Regions:
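Conserved S-adenosyl-L-methionine
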Residues: 172-252
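Non-catalytic, mostly N-terminal accessory regions of nucleic-acid modification and defense proteins
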Residues: 1-193
């Protein structure tokens, strides 16, 4: 469970979007998801660089010295959250629109992947530099509280609380299945390493993510020490469908 202080910060983040003119709950959660992904991309790259350094192994950062974004070559460091979050509002907004967002849309090299397919028409919708600056500051506070938390899965709980905003609105019949119900259903199904798992109304892919986590916990050696089964897990096991393309982008 997340703390009252963290819930208040998340509620304040939604208020910031509303005050900035972005009130559609699906648009809000979509934009928050993009920004959290950009933040986590920086964190995971830093972690992998440290692990490689500890093991004395070479590491090629995704934020290379020079990165091609469209027809421009830019300094990859300026795509990192830890760098651009200190920019003035106007410069940060320009960097997000012109460099960072186009960069994340083309991250996956396989153009046939779900990520590439559904990110192809993704749009950065924050309308003003001031709104982006306030949202980035608010997310920094949320991440600070998550890092200070002693909860086992505080990030999952935080995103779960964010998604609850969609179910509260009840837009187009989109309602969230509670996570403990999802876990129970996955445990009852007890997926195997060679299964194909499909959710015909996947929404934000909660069932698929939970099934993936279950397999990593209960079939880890069977999957990750067998090249064929690992490829199946990474590329051919999970399928999600939804009538709402925004939900598919969030899920992907």
């Amino acid at each position: 469970m997340i703390t009252g202080e963290l819930k208040n910060k998340i509620d304040s983040l939604w208020d910031i979007f509303a005050a900035g003119g972005l009130v559609n709950p699906l648009d809000v959660i979509e934009q928050i998801t993009y920004l959290m992904f950009i933040h986590d991309l920086d964190d995971s790259d830093n972690l992998r660089a440290k692990e490689a350094a500890m093991l004395g192994l070479p590491y090629q950062s995704i934020f290379a010295d020079e990165i091609q974004v469209g027809e421009r070559t830019i300094d990859g460091q300026q795509l990192k959250w830890s760098v651009f979050h200190d920019f003035p509002a106007g410069k940060m907004y320009s960097a997000m629109q012109e460099w960072v967002f186009p960069f994340i849309k083309t991250l996956h090299t396989d153009k046939n992947s779900a990520y590439s397919k559904y990110m192809d028409d993704a749009i950065f919708k924050l309308p003003t530099p001031l709104l982006l600056s306030k949202v980035v500051d608010s997310l920094d506070e949320i991440y600070r509280l998550m890092n200070e938390s002693q909860a086992v899965d505080v990030r999952g709980d935080t995103y779960e609380y964010l998604l609850s905003k969609i179910s509260q609105s009840g837009r187009n019949g989109q309602f969230r299945t509670p996570r403990h119900i999802i876990r129970m259903m996955v445990e009852l199904m007890d997926p195997k390493a060679d299964d194909v798992i499909c959710d015909p109304a996947c929404g934000t892919s909660g069932f698929l993510v939970s099934a993936g986590e279950y397999l990593k916990e209960h079939r880890k050696e069977e999957i990750f020490f067998d090249r064929q089964k690992k490829d199946h897990y990474m590329n051919h096991m999970f399928f999600g469908y939804d009538m709402d393309r925004t939900m598919l982008r969030i899920g992907a």
